[in-house]
Amino acid sequence: MNVSQDTIYAQASEHISDFQFDNRVAGVFSDMIRRSVPGYTQIINTIGDFADRFVMPNTQIYDLGCSLGAATLSIRRQIQGRQCRIIAVDNSESMVARCQENLNAYVSDTDVDLVCGDIRDIDIQNASLVVLNFTLQFLPPEDRETLIAKIYQGLNPGGILVLSEKIRFEDAPIQTLLEEQHLDFKRANGYSELEISQKRSALENVMKPDTLTTHQQRLTSQGFSHFSLWFQCFNFASMVAIK
C-alpha cells in the first residue's frame, strides 16, 4: 500500500483551523501517525498479541476510533477460526472509506462491521476485547467516564480494555522534558518547526490529555480490578485494564 507523505502543515497559514480527521488527514494518516507517535507500530502489533491471549470464541471485539483499521487488522490476523466479530467504529467518513479499502485487501474468516458513527452511541455487549487507541483524548473530558462505564458493562468477565493515549504530567519539569523529547522525535522524523507549531495550534482545542493517575482512577472507579501501564515512550502510553 502506497503511503502519502504528510505535508498538511508545511505551508504557513494565517488561520489554523481545529484539527479534523477529514479527507486530507485520512490521505496521509499512516505517515502522520508513524512520524508523530513514538512506538505506534509496537502498540499495534501488541494489540494483536493481546487479542490472541484474550479473545474468546463467539465473542465480539470493539475497535473504537478505528481510523484506517490498523488495530482491527492486527487483531484479525491473530484470531482466525474463533467465530468472532469485530465492530470497528469511527466518526470520520473519510477514515471509514479508507479503512474499508484496507480491510478489503486482506482475506479473513473474521467478519468486521465497519460503522461510521459516534463511539459514545455504540452498544457494547459480549465483548472479550475493547480497543481505544488514541481515541479517548479527543472526547470531551466530561464524556470519558460514561464511555469507560459502558465498556466495563459490555465486557465479559476476564475481558480486556487496551487504552492508548497521549498523556500529561502533574510534575512540570517532567512535562517539559518529555514534551521536548517528543518534539525532538518529530524533528528527527522530518517535521519542520513550522509544521510542529501549526499542528500544535490545530490540536490544542480538540485533544485534551489526562494524567496516568486520572486514567487509572477512572478505570478502577468503574470496576476494573486489574490495571497496568504496559508501554510508555515520552508522553505516549498504552494501558490495559481487565474485568
Swiss-Prot record:
Binding positions for S-adenosyl-L-methionine per the UniProt entry: 40, 65-67, 90-91, 118-119, 133, 200
One Pfam entry name: Methyltransf_25
GO biological process, one term: tRNA wobble uridine modification
A GO term for molecular function: S-adenosyl-L-methionine binding
InterPro entries: CmoA, Methyltransf_25, SAM-dependent_MTases_sf
Keywords: S-adenosyl-L-methionine, Transferase
Record EC number: 2.1.3.-
Catalysed transformations (reactions): prephenate + S-adenosyl-L-methionine = carboxy-S-adenosyl-L-methionine + 3-phenylpyruvate + H2O
Source organism, top-level taxon: Bacteria
Coiled-coil parts of chain: none
Function: Catalyzes the conversion of S-adenosyl-L-methionine (SAM) to carboxy-S-adenosyl-L-methionine (Cx-SAM).
Subunit record text: Homodimer.
Family of the protein in this entry: Belongs to the class I-like SAM-binding methyltransferase superfamily. Cx-SAM synthase family.
Name the record gives this protein: Carboxy-S-adenosyl-L-methionine synthase
Organism: Shewanella baltica (strain OS155 / ATCC BAA-1091)
